[in-house]
Amino acid sequence: MGQKPKVAFICVHNSCRSQIAEALGKYLASDIFESFSAGTETVPQINQDAVRLIKQLYGIDMAQTQYSKSLNELPPVDIVITMGCNVACPYLPCKHREDWGLDDPTGHGDDVFAETIQAIHRNILDLKGRIQNMI
């Protein structure tokens, strides 16, 4: 197999959903694809509830390994996944694009965050399977 496909997870601020997707993509599917995330805007730090829950659930410390990035910091990617930002994401050249339609859990309780994390987990595994079947 040649190079692994590069997947970019995109949302507005690159502080919560796309960061979770990048972390879980690396954790669950790094053998199949490379994970990146970015936003149309950036924030000084990623969502602290997301950091706390991903550390509790998966042992991943996103505060140490990830930061909010803008779209122009991405390498060329093969697949673009938007999180459901309800904004028109700028055009990023890619071979495949899809929207996961996930509501932002920011400002909600841990139960809403956990539901979002589980949805992203399922979507990452589904994407991994689809990419494996294409290779």
For each feature predicted by the language model, list its residue ranges.
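Short polar/charged helix/loop
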Residues: G2-I135
